[in-house]
């Protein structure tokens, strides 16, 4: 592990929730792509992720990265049961909006809007928060995501 924090160059830091792609910069040095071992590549699950500084940073702990990536893939890409992809992304956007992660909210809101074709509703969630007025089904999904995020036992 590096013994110092990186200080990113001047850049526009997000101040509001958005569906736009945000400029993510690490606070710790990601591994160089050339330094990735076969174990790192296995943990990435998809070799294309080696191009991403985000995933190369997570690769510093291959066991955690592999568990995180397999969990992520199962949550969002598993076609055997569960909610449609748009609503999985909606739940993730709501959880991110609730816990205040502008970066994760932007990713999941973008996917929720793309898959659902309900851009205005997704934008309302971002603008107004998890109390935004949505239709009955989407409100139930948002409420469940918030309850699970707040305290799993509340769910």
Regions found by a protein language model. Name each.
Residues 1-155:
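Hydrophobic alpha-helical segments
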């Amino acid at each position: 592990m590096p013994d110092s924090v990186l200080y990113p160059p001047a850049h526009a830091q997000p101040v509001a929730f958005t569906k736009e792609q945000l400029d993510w910069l690490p606070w710790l040095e990601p591994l160089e792509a050339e330094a990735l071992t076969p174990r790192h590549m296995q943990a990435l699950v998809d070799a294309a992720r080696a191009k991403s500084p985000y995933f190369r940073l997570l690769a510093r702990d291959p066991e955690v990265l592999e568990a995180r990536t397999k969990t992520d893939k199962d949550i969002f890409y598993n076609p055997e049961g569960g909610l449609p992809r748009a609503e999985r992304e909606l739940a993730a956007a709501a959880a991110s909006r609730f816990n205040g992660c502008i970066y994760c909210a932007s990713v999941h809101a973008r996917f929720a809007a793309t898959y659902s074709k309900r851009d205005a509703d997704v934008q309302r969630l971002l603008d107004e928060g998890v109390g935004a007025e949505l239709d009955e089904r989407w409100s139930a999904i948002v409420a469940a995501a918030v309850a699970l995020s707040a305290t799993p036992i509340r769910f």
